[in-house]
């Protein structure tokens, strides 16, 4: 029996975790769903922005994947990994979380549609967090 092929999806935004239903958010959900239904093993990652309600979306921390520190701009930042499922699509979403970078922010822009000044650091943290987590999966 052959092992299933594996695909890693990494996205900044996936519906339904960010409220507004946009074409890109739907696509970022539908692609993993499509490949999963065709026998591929998929893993999907996104940042755990502050507007994502942990209780409503049933996120829980994955202790065995959390707990390392990533150094960004000479500062240690703890990496927290949370997971939730989209039941109707039968896919799991892994969330990269850190209070400094994601906790109080809705996305990559503020309420006035201005990009946050540390978006570069946040993106680096997110990318490195995905890579470190994939090593442990």
Listing of model-derived features with the role each one plays in the protein:
Residues 1-84:
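N-terminal subdomain of nucleotide-sugar transferases
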Residues 48-136:
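A conserved catalytic-core segment of Leloir-type glycosyltransferases
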């Amino acid at each position: 029996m052959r092992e299933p092929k594996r695909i890693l999806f990494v996205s900044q935004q996936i519906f339904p975790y960010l409220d507004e239903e946009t074409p890109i958010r739907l696509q970022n959900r539908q692609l993993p769903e499509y490949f999963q239904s065709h026998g591929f093993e998929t893993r999907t990652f996104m940042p755990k922005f502050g507007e994502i309600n942990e209780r409503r979306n049933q996120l829980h921390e994955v202790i065995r994947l959390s707990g390392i520190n990533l150094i960004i701009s000479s500062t240690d930042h703890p990496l927290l990994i949370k997971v939730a499922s989209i039941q109707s699509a039968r896919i799991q979403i892994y969330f990269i979380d850190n209070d400094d970078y994601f906790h109080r922010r809705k996305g990559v822009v503020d309420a006035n549609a201005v990009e946050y000044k540390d978006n570069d650091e946040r993106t680096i943290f997110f990318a490195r967090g995905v890579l470190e987590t994939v090593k442990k999966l």
